[in-house]
Amino acid sequence: MIRFEIHGDNLTITDAIRNYIEDKIGKLERYFNDVPNAVAHVKVKTYQNSTTKIEVTIPLKNVTLRAEERHDDLYAGIDLVTSKLERQVRKYKTRVNRKHKTHGEPEAFVAEVQEAPPENVDDVNAEPTNDSEIEIIRSKQFSLKPMDSEEAVLQMELLGHDFYIFTDRETDGTSIVYKRKDGKYGLIETTE
């Protein structure tokens, strides 16, 4: 059973909001043979311009489901986040079940589901629902240059990319800088 930890930032989580979140995201349970004992971490944040950001993270045994959406309407945002999570589960289900079939093992992770009609959500930014094999269409090899994170951001901007991989001059480890949806930058550092 999926349990919920719902936190509001600049917003009081009412019973109506809590019930809506639990009802919508709880429908993901239908994709599992054995419903995982998982905790869905839900963060709802309201900004001054009345935009709402909904973040959902569900750590499972073999995969972490995560989706985020900003929307003017809280309930529409919850619907969009649920759709994204559902697509992630379907893609993962397809990969895992295909892998188990080729190795002659029983389908361990996700049950086949009666396809429910998609809920009426206008998601203009929807990802394609292609559940076919993952196809790598381009491969590159290059040497990582030692630099600091500021220089890596400049290189990323010069190349017009959304991320840049480099060797951190201070730690000598591999790091990644990336551009976030809010226009700011993030840094991922690897550990030994």
Curated annotation (Swiss-Prot):
Keywords noted in UniProt: Cytoplasm, Translation regulation
GO molecular function terms listed in the Swiss-Prot or TrEMBL record: ribosomal small subunit binding
Gene Ontology CC annotations of this record: cytosolic small ribosomal subunit
UniProt protein name: Ribosome hibernation promotion factor
Family: Belongs to the HPF/YfiA ribosome-associated protein family. Long HPF subfamily.
Region (Disordered): 95-129
Main location group: cytoplasm
Keyword Cytoplasm: yes
A Pfam family recorded for this sequence: Ribosomal_S30AE
Acidic residues composition bias: residue spans: 120-129
Compartments, record wording: Cytoplasm
Main function: Required for dimerization of active 70S ribosomes into 100S ribosomes in stationary phase; 100S ribosomes are translationally inactive and sometimes present during exponential growth.
Highest taxon of source: Bacteria
Record text on subunit structure and interactions: Interacts with 100S ribosomes.
GO biological process: negative regulation of translational elongation
InterPro entries membership: HPF/YfiA_ribosome-assoc, HPF_long/plastid, RHF-like, RHF/RaiA, Ribosom_S30AE_C, Ribosom_S30AE_C_sf
Leader sequence segment: none
CDD domains found in the cross-reference section: RaiA
